[in-house]
């Protein structure tokens, strides 16, 4: 086992509230909203701060994923565990992604948020959505599969394709495990490199309030507070549906696995506020991986489930896609039969797998879905373009919580979860616990040989 052992540190003193990240992010968001509302020109000019923070996060995502996966897989006693963890994760993703699509479809049929608008498609300004539609044409299933394979071993680290990094990391980790003792020096080096990389994550996260401020000031300055209430019924329906999905559906699976989804949300409050401020679940990916390990999830499970979930487990995006598609159909008086809705569901199941956890990806994925389902006019997307930016925040929050729950659940299924540590961390004792060993527990994972 390649772990960094250390004595348990003395109990630390709880930081004052104003030094805690979640308070700083909340304060920054409020200041951003006020600046964007009262000085919209200055607010819109704050966009570079948000963009800069997102770039900083993207800078560290690739090394965090690579090191976590490689050291986790290479430390496993049996490589069959890799395939087993991946298989269980994909089974979870498929089940709950489909359930999220169905929930959005059912809610849209029951609430009918677009009924009564009687929009004439010919009168809509289609130029605003042309860019999204053109991008959606590139999102074919074959193109998505081929895009996972990088041109070189180095190219994933200079791009922003998480799945390419994941593929290279898995292959390298498996190769390192197969060479046995000959690969031990490399594994020791990568193990040692993990600690400063996660320290770098902590340093970058200190800039989170600045990034949240810039992103929120730009949003309000650009679109105005009035856009928050525009098409209020659709937005409200989406927010309520997502909240019910998290509390009821994810809450039920969490209870079945012995933990509380509300306590998990409280534990991740700083990351959730960051996601809220930036409208990108990707902005908190490195921090999520670190916190899931601290909560008792095995390193190998975290390394496989979290990055994969960012493309295959997007509950919020799935709810949004079917809900928004039916809203457009209702608003344009387009009648969809049960067969049409089932076809929409099947297409969305495929197209949603290519959505990344970045701002605007959900809208592009919706365009890709509607392009394949001719019954719903793609031009109708102009109806929701104005409020999509604010729905993006809810999508990202739901996606983020869904991946956090998935990580704990798959760890539990693998018997690779320190349940006692999880409960203590979720009860607020995280800062009084020693750091978990950075390496995966290969003995625990090996209990379930295929």
UniProtKB/Swiss-Prot annotation:
Its main location: membrane. Pfam families: SDF. The chain crosses the membrane at residues 25-45, 56-76, 90-110, 162-182, 200-220, 234-254, 319-339, 367-387. It comes from the Bacteria. It is found in: Cell inner membrane. SUPFAM superfamilies: Proton glutamate symport protein (SSF118215). Keywords: Cell inner membrane, Cell membrane, Membrane, Symport, Transmembrane, Transmembrane helix, Transport. It is a multi-pass membrane protein. PROSITE patterns: NA_DICARBOXYL_SYMP_1, NA_DICARBOXYL_SYMP_2. GO terms for cellular component: plasma membrane. GO terms for molecular function: fumarate transmembrane transporter activity; malate:proton symporter activity; succinate transmembrane transporter activity. One of its GO terms (biological process) is L-aspartate transmembrane transport. The keyword Phosphoprotein does not apply. Belongs to the dicarboxylate/amino acid:cation symporter (DAACS) (TC 2.A.23) family. Responsible for the transport of dicarboxylates such as succinate, fumarate, and malate from the periplasm across the membrane. This is C4-dicarboxylate transport protein. It comes from Acidovorax sp. (strain JS42). The lineage of its organism: Bacteria, Pseudomonadati, Pseudomonadota, Betaproteobacteria, Burkholderiales.
């Amino acid at each position: 086992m390649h772990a960094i052992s250390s004595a348990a540190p003395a109990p630390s003193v709880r930081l004052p509230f104003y030094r805690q990240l979640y308070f700083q992010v909340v304060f920054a968001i409020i200041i951003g909203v006020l600046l964007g509302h009262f000085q919209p020109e200055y607010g819109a000019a704050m966009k570079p701060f948000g963009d800069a923070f997102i770039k900083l996060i993207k800078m560290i995502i690739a090394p965090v994923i690579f090191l976590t996966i490689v050291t986790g897989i290479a430390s496993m006693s049996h490589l069959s565990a890799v395939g087993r963890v991946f298989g269980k994760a994909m089974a979870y993703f498929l089940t709950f992604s489909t359930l999220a699509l169905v929930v959005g479809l059912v809610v849209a049929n029951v609430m009918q948020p677009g009924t009564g608008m009687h929009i004439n498609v010919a009168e809509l300004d289609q130029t605003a959505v042309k860019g999204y539609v053109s991008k959606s044409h590139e999102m074919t299933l074959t193109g998505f599969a081929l895009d996972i394979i990088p041109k070189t071993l180095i190219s994933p680290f200079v791009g922003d394709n998480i799945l390419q990094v994941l593929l290279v990391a898995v292959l390298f980790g498996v190769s390192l495990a197969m060479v046995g003792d000959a690969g031990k020096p490399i594994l020791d080096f990568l193990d040692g490199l993990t600690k400063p990389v996660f320290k770098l994550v902590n340093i970058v996260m200190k800039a989170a309030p600045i990034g949240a401020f810039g992103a929120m000031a730009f949003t309000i300055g650009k679109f105005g507070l009035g856009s928050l209430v525009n098409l209020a019924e659709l937005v409200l329906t989406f927010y309520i549906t997502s909240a019910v999905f998290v509390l009821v559906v994810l809450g039920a699976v969490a209870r079945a696995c012995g933990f509380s989804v509300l306590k998990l949300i409280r534990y991740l409050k700083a990351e959730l506020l960051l996601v809220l401020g930036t409208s990108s679940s990707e902005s908190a990916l490195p921090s999520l991986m670190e916190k899931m390990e601290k909560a008792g999830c095995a390193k190998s499970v975290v390394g496989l489930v979290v990055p994969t979930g960012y493309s295959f487990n997007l509950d919020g995006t799935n709810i949004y896609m079917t809900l928004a598609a039916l809203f457009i159909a209702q608003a344009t008086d387009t009648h969809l039969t049960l067969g049409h809705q089932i076809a929409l569901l099947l297409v969305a199941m495929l197209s949603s797998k290519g959505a990344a956890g970045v701002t605007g990806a959900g809208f592009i994925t919706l365009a890709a879905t509607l392009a394949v389902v001719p019954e719903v006019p793609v031009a109708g997307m102009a109806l929701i373009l104005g409020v999509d930016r604010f729905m993006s925040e809810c999508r990202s929050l739901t996606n983020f919580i869904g991946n956090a729950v998935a990580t704990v659940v798959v760890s539990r299924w693998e018997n690779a979860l320190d349940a006692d540590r999880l409960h203590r961390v979720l009860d607020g004792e995280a800062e009084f616990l020693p750091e978990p060993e950075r390496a995966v527990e290969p003995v625990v994972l090996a209990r379930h040989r295929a």
